[in-house]
């Protein structure tokens, strides 16, 4: 969880004292019928798994949707982006008028909610408005804080991003 000084926007090291050790990136036993490469989001336990096969998975700690913003079902990665522009959906602007100033898009950077890497979830060719994104706020890992998107520490998200091609299946379990 060290610094990433060579990124377009240098990413600071993670203060690991702000993360429960159980949420640190790890390889674990994980029995599933899903094929290797599948991403499984477990919002109840604040984990994202990347199935590796042979009963193993890479497990990442995550933040998830707060009460009333959780969803579940199957999706797939329809798009990937490094240092994306963030545009709040109309529904978010209605709930949080202070984000209206970003209706035309928020420039990439460390303050951008989508961070350094984002995987966009699609169903039937349509963007669901949900993402797997990177965060530089370790204190949010293991909590329900978002409007339904799933956040991983930047270093973890970069690892997952690099291993995940467009078209990868994503299974979001019930909370």
Q: Residue locations for each model-derived region?
A:
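N-terminal pre-domains immediately preceding structured catalytic cores
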Residues: 1-175
């Amino acid at each position: 969880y060290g610094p990433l000084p060579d990124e377009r926007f240098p990413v600071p090291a993670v203060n690991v004292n702000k993360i429960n050790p159980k949420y640190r990136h790890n390889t674990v036993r994980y029995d599933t019928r899903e094929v290797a490469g599948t991403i499984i989001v477990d919002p109840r336990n604040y984990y994202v798994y990347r199935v590796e096969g042979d009963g193993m998975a890479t497990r990442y700690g995550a933040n998830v949707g707060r009460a009333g913003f959780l969803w579940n079902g199957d999706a797939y990665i329809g798009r990937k982006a490094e240092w994306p522009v963030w545009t709040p959906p109309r529904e978010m602007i209605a709930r949080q008028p202070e984000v209206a100033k970003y209706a035309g898009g928020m420039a990439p950077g460390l303050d951008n909610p989508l961070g350094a890497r984002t995987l966009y979830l699609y169903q039937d060719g349509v963007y669901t408005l949900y993402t797997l994104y990177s965060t530089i706020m370790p204190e949010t890992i293991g909590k329900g804080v978002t409007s339904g998107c799933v956040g991983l520490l930047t270093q973890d998200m970069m690892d997952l991003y690099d291993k995940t091609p467009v078209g990868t299946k994503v299974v979001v379990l019930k909370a």
